Amino acid sequence: MKLVLVSGRSGSGKSVLLRMLEDLGYYCVDNLPLPMMGTLLKELSGNTNLVAISVDIRNLPEKESELIKHLTNLPDGVELLSFFLNSSDEVLLKRYNETRRLHPLSHDNVSLKEAIEIEGRSLEPLANIVDHYIDTSTLNIYDLNDQVREILLGNLDKELMINFESFGFKHGMPTEADFMFDVRFLPNPHWEPDLRPMTGLDKPVQDFLNERPRVNQFIKQIEDLLETWLPDLERNNRSYLTIAIGCTGGQHRSVYITERLAAHFKDGKHKIQVRHRELKNADH
């Protein structure tokens, strides 16, 4: 079992990191008292191999020796990896003032500034023994995600599932699309009597559209757009991306262009799915 312990100063990004770990398949528990950690791991044994626990100042033992004892006396087969997130006092003060949240150590006799300073001093023993110390003062959530993914997975490559979907506007627009392209302005094979009963999967229709320079130009521009922004979409921690291509009836132009785009991106590192909404038994 792999156990990730998330600790750090309040406001430094522990909750954000825990959500990232959940997206990576970890069973996550927020603010678990350390004395209960062994019991939890035994209960989860056999059910999951990935567990993440966050702790804060309110559920840590006061003595450093007790802290080390809890982190070393783990059940057999548990591999511990620990993170400590920190930010400067100034950044934490700004974050709390912006969110108007209550600091866990704030009360009538302690100001926010004092609570931040007290917590920082109290957590120093833990900060000194963790595997990975990350200062989030200048990081956004995507930078933090990249650092953690690199530590856990060894690289920043994330497999993105791209769904290419053709549809007909007269049957309604798909609601799940991230990008939608309207291709109704392109030459329509529907007006060719021989091509009308066919679809964009048939070679005569493909030849008809491939011979039109504007069709190929438009496809190339969509490819360039997606190739430019896919890295940023991946950094946004996406798992799925849906590209919808629509023509009037969803039979010819949208089907052909969807197939062309899917074939182009199949050569990359992404998983590709194709759906032709208005055609039966044509998905792949």
UniProtKB/Swiss-Prot annotation:
NCBIfam families, per database record? PRK05416.1
List the Pfam families hit by this protein, alphabetically. Answer: PapZ_C (PF22740), RapZ-like_N (PF03668)
**SUPFAM superfamilies per the record?**
P-loop containing nucleoside triphosphate hydrolases
Record-linked HAMAP family: RapZ_like
Does the keyword rRNA processing belong to this entry?
no
Indicate yes or no for the key word ATP-binding: yes
Lineage: superkingdom: Bacteria
Binding sites annotated in the UniProt record for GTP: 56-59
Q: Which UniProt keywords apply?
A: ATP-binding, GTP-binding, Nucleotide-binding
> InterPro entries recorded for this chain?
P-loop_NTPase (IPR027417), RapZ-like (IPR005337), RapZ-like_N (IPR053930), RapZ_C (IPR053931)
Name under which the protein is recorded: Nucleotide-binding protein Shal_3708
Which GO MF term does the entry hold, naming one? Answer: GTP binding
Residue sites binding ATP per the record: 8-15
| Family under the similarity heading | Belongs to the RapZ-like family.
Q: What does this protein do?
A: Displays ATPase and GTPase activities.
